[in-house]
Amino acid sequence: ETRTANLIIGTSGGTAGKNATSYKLALPSTWIKEMGLTPEQRQVELRFDGASIVITRTLSFAEFLEASRHAGHKVLLLSCYSGDALCARIAADETEKTVCVENLAADCLKLPFGNNKNPIWEDYQHFLEDRCIPKTRAGLQEYLEAIGVDGYEPLEIIRKTQGRMAEDDLWLTVEELK
């Protein structure tokens, strides 16, 4: 269903800068109900690609996993540990290139995305690379051969090394969900 709407434009208050403007949009209540939004569960995620704005209901970690698996997507579950303690779980939908994190530790230094509770695919890719030997390291090819990896593919390196680094006690497991 497609509808045309007008923006509600007003002046911003509070700590907004001088002459700041706010923009709002009234949405049909049937759409809101169909999305499962309620006064108690009203948080949404906004995505902007330069031309379109997409509004989706914010999913819990379990809902994200279920929706991705139900859609038949390739989903990876990464468990992040500090020593023996499970600190976070990352669900990576490789089909849609979306990611969801469930933080289980209070210390942001033990979390894969720090204080970022809503990482995007690029954040995930950066995290994977951070848990690997740098691409520019001398002797990289010999290292990859020694661990049995054909090329510089962060996820494959992590599968072999558990993403262990000399400077911390963090490590990862990777599981493909069916």
Predicted stretch roles:
Residues 1-178:
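Phosphate/dinucleotide-binding and metal-coordinating scaffold of catalytic cores
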